Structure formats: structure tokens, C-alpha cells
């Protein structure tokens, strides 16, 4: 079966929800917990971080009776809520919105960025904050580990990209941005490692393993809100606030080459998050101002939409790519099972 055949078989099934945050869910990361079970961690505008105990294979159903005043004629009088996990531990320390999270490869260390201008390094097994990083002069928006996890990258509203060691010491600062540093993505292509950095000035800078800027994708009129890449490190997916998605060659040096831009997609809706997964070939997920969308790269309309919970701000897959997690502005996290019927 060809890739073209497989990609048309992808779909999502709603599994259930996670409830525990008192504010919008802004960031999601998923690693591997005990016995190989997915370890989901979320950050929120309620200033907290939650480690979740997932019960994906043993959901709990609740029947919620609706207030008679809220029921329109002919509508159901009750709804079924399916819970697929519960908060295992809440991590507190930030005194403003938690804006971004990054988890290391063995799921033992977490870094969090906050609008309180700080970064925290957490030990996941003990759920304790190990280090407080201070240095940004304004809200911190984005965070990422370097490929070897010896350094931490952070970007903020002070238009700076900072490099830290795990002791909380600033090793280098890049002030070449003309707008907020909104998103950071670690990319590996063969033996080469890159850091892609998006800004509200509309530009994306590609940094090499020496952390010097190797290439800049020029800025446009609209802010870059999210970045994603394929597993092989060939293509970079850039989401802009106005709803444009660009698919670019990561290693092309000449940003003006026509061949550099593989695809430009106009979705017509504000984008908060983008997530591409190579397993599903031409399929990518979008968190938008209205909800969740699943799209094909060459498709003009969404293949799947969920607009029940308002804006979708965060997206992640579990390690097996069996589940998609989406964080919403109403504080809920929805869980979807990926169905790839073309797989044998």
C-alpha cells in the first residue's frame, strides 16, 4: 500500500476528557511513565502544572443532568462525560501564566516558562522545582531543550533568545529579533541538529549545532505562533497568526528560492498551535481560535473539527502516536484516538 493510500485512511475518535485546570491549557508534553504508560504534563493560565494519571483503557463515565433553563426544546436533558484520567500531582511555583513546557528524553526533567519572567527546572519523579532561572526582563513565552539536553533555550516578550545551562546560568543571548520570541523547536536531521526559532516579527531563524544563525526565513506581516517538523528533519511547518501555514525545506540556504517553499496553505482562521506527525504522512493538526482541526497538506477544508470547547492552544501526541491530546481555553484537555486504517 502506498503512502497516498494510507493517508486517506486517517481519522480521529474522541476518547474522553481530562479536567483539573482552572484556566486555559497553554502547553502539553507527553513522555513515558511507569510501565511504559503515557506520561502527560500540562501547563495552564491558572499558574499551575499538572502531572496526569491516565486511564485511557478504563474510562469513567458520568451523566450530567442539565439545568432546565439551559435546555432548548427538543434537546437532550443530560449529557455523558467520559473521564480518561485524573490529576496525579499539581506543581506550583510560578506566580503568573505558565506559557510553555519542555520534557527531556527520559521524562525525568521538565522546564517551564512563565509570564512571571522566570523559568523553572522540575524533577518529575519527586515533582519538585530544582532551579529557578532569572534573566528575562519580560514574560517568557517559549522553552526547549537542546538536542543533548545540556542547554535550555528560552524566548520571551523582551525579544531575546537565551541559552542556559541546567544550573540556571545564562551562557549566551541572541538579541537579533525585532519582536517577541514566540516558539522554539529542536530539529534533528541525520547527524545535524538545528534549533528553529519563530518570532512575532514574522521571521524564523534556523540555528546550527554551534547555535549561530545559519539561515533566516524573512518575516512577513503576521506573527509566527507555532512550529513543527517531520521526523526526518526535512520539512519545517510554520504557522502564522493570520491562518497561513508554510511548509519549508529546513536545510535550503536561499530563502528566496521558489523551491524552498514546498506548500503555502491558507486556512482562514487564527492559528495557535501546529503539530505534524510523519506516521500520518500528509496529515497535520491545528489548534485554532475556534477549536481543533485536522487537515491534509493539500486539502482545502478540514478533515475533522472539534469546536465545542473554544480555542485550542496546545497539542501533543503520546510516544506511540496512538493518542492525540488537545488543550483548550476552557481548561479542559481532550483525548482522541488516532485511527490509521491503512496500517497492517
Language-model regions: role of each:
Residues 15-18, 88-90, 128-133, 169-174, ...:
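A short beta-strand motif characteristic of beta-propeller blades
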Residues 43-46, 113-116, 154-158, 198-201, ...:
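Conserved strand-to-loop turn within each blade of WD40 beta-propeller repeats
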Residues 313-344:
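Blade-level signature of beta-propeller repeat domains, shared across WD40, Kelch, NHL, RCC1
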Residues 18-25, 84, 91-98, 134-140, ...:
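WD40/WD-repeat beta-propeller blade N-cap
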Residues 32-36, 105-106, 147-148, 188-191, ...:
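Residue-level detector of Asp-centered blade-edge/turn motifs that repeat once per structural unit
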Residues 49-53, 119-122, 161-165, 204-208, ...:
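WD40-repeat beta-propellers
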